[in-house]
A protein has these predicted regions:
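Short, C-terminally biased terminal segments at protein or domain edges
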Residues: 1-117
Length: 117
């Protein structure tokens, strides 16, 4: 997968997270949970985007690794919201599948980049 595919998919994921969080805020879901999900869900794409201007391969890898950590955190908050009946099973699985796809792409990219060092 190319970096542009990662950028596109991570931005789409962030938008879906934002749409979900708007709904959750309207339902008066715990603000801390909603804010954490927005923060980490949008940070994935922000770090991938920022990597385009990395100062070198190590910096590029670092940005992707941060995106990977944010992806893992995002999945945690989705699980918590699902397990507390704040989001539907359908919504959870849709976003979780997107998150897993991003994580796989990031892991693959980081492994490839580390081999090039």
């Amino acid at each position: 997968m190319t970096e542009s595919v990662l950028r596109t998919k991570s931005k789409e994921y962030a938008k879906n997270i934002i749409f979900l969080c708007r709904e959750l805020k309207a339902k008066h879901t715990e603000a801390t949970l909603v804010n954490q999900l927005i923060r980490c869900g949008s940070s994935i794409g922000a770090n991938i985007h920022e990597a385009r201007y990395a100062q070198g391969t190590k910096d590029f890898i670092s940005k992707f690794e941060i995106a990977l950590k944010e992806c893992n955190e995002s999945e945690y908050w989705l699980e918590l919201l699902y397990e507390t009946n704040c989001i539907s099973e359908e919504e959870f699985h849709k976003l979780q599948n997107n998150c897993v796809e991003l994580r796989r792409m990031l892991v693959s990219s980081v492994k490839t980049l580390k081999k090039q060092l």
